[in-house]
A protein has these predicted regions:
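Peripheral, non-AAA+ core regions of ATP-driven protein-machinery
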Residues: 1-137
Length: 137
């Protein structure tokens, strides 16, 4: 996940990670399994470098491809429920994980295809524009 994040920061979000001393710490007591933290890691680094606070009522999940796509992940329903219990008002998820049942939940679900969409939803109130380099596959 971290390698993909560094590539996406450089190619699609105009940040060259080599220009910064980036240290990621995943505490040993926190279980981390699979690639679903890719989007969150990218937003964390982006917001730190840009000095932008992320609303703590927004949760997000999704695998990040090297081409900037937000890929589907497993366990989406329990992740949304955990975010809701933790106080999230909005959860950003991969579009491929969307289910119509989400319309009935008491939490706002935003389904996205690309990392630029995630950034726009997270930093939109600040009026920041990101470059969009869409690649056809």
């Amino acid at each position: 996940s971290v390698d993909n994040v560094m590539t996406v920061l450089r190619k699609y979000l105009n940040i060259d990670p080599r220009d910064y001393d980036i240290h990621l710490n995943f505490p040993g007591g926190i279980p981390i399994d699979g690639p679903s933290a890719g989007v969150t890691i990218a937003v964390s680094i982006y917001s730190s470098i840009k000095g932008i606070l992320v609303d703590n009522h927004i949760a997000m999940t999704g695998e990040l491809s090297v081409r900037g796509y937000v890929k589907p992940i497993g366990g989406i329903v329990p992740k949304i429920e955990a975010a809701r219990r933790a106080g999230a008002k909005t959860v950003i998820i991969p579009k491929e994980n969307w289910q119509d049942i989400f319309k009935t939940l008491d939490i706002n679900i935003i389904a996205v295809d690309r990392i630029e969409e995630v950034i726009e939803h997270v930093v939109h109130p600040y009026g920041i524009n990101v470059r969009t380099n869409t690649v056809s596959v």
